[in-house]
From Swiss-Prot:
It comes from the Eukaryota. It is found in: Nucleus; Chromosome, Centromere; Cytoplasm, Cytoskeleton, Spindle. Component of the chromosomal passenger complex (CPC), a complex that acts as a key regulator of mitosis. The CPC complex has essential functions at the centromere in ensuring correct chromosome alignment and segregation and is required for chromatin-induced microtubule stabilization and spindle assembly. Contributes to CPC function by facilitating loading of the CPC onto chromosomes. Disulfide bonds: none annotated. It comes from Xenopus tropicalis (Western clawed frog). This is Borealin. Component of the CPC at least composed of survivin/birc5, incenp, cdca8/borealin and/or cdca9/dasra-A, and aurkb/aurora-B. Interacts with incenp (via N-terminus). Pfam families: Borealin, Nbl1_Borealin_N. Residues 153-163 have a biased composition (Polar residues).
Amino acid sequence: MAPTKKKTSRKPKNRCVKNEKLASFIKDFDSQVKIITEELKASVVNILKEVDSQYNIEIIKLPMAIREMCWLDYIAKGGSQKALEAAATVKVDMEEITSTVTKTPFKLDKKVKKGKCKSDETLEPNPLQSVIRTKTKAKVAAKKPSTARKTRASTANLTNTSKRTSKRGRATPSASKQIETSLLGYTPAATPRIDTSIFKTPALRTPCLQEPVYTFSANGSPLAGMDELFINVPAGDGKNIRLLASEVDSLDINRLDNQAFENIKLLSSQLQRFCKKLK
């Protein structure tokens, strides 16, 4: 008998290789499809933006009459050309109206007023109106005109110069009243000399060495001298905080600001140096 052929396991191996290749191809295909779809979506968005911009440009090119027109009226007039013709006619009519308005001169109503006045004069006078007029005239005549105005007007008419004919004393209301000299006191004949060195000091200055300093409160009242030891700590906003030796332990630290803390630290270091010198 002829020898039988040996069975080989090549078929399943080939199938596994084919499946792997197919799977890798499908993965590549899916990735490329995703990339292409994303590009298409982006291009669609860009095209829509371009269409909107072109649409807006075309609308801007149209005249204002068509832009303000309702779309139903636009379609009823038969589209773009007929609507343009209608808008052009409206524009021409408006230009004619404005030109006629600008050319026509303004009419004055003076003649009408004169005619009305003449007609009123021809009418019979009303007794009530005559009584009212006489009353008003009497009231006006009762007022006495001021003398100052008359004198000024007469001087202006007589002489056109700026010089005054009558010299009057420039008396203020307070000076016009008669005040006794005893109330005002004695005025010296010669003016006293003032020491100019007083005005050379600035508004704020630091006290000199061994100079007696008198303290004042925020209300402006002077504070009495104290035998107890105290320290003035400068704080923010130009304020000074007085610290007594007996009240240092019970002081609320939250009330102090950063500048006060720094000044206290600086003072403590300087006091330590001073105490070392005393020893």
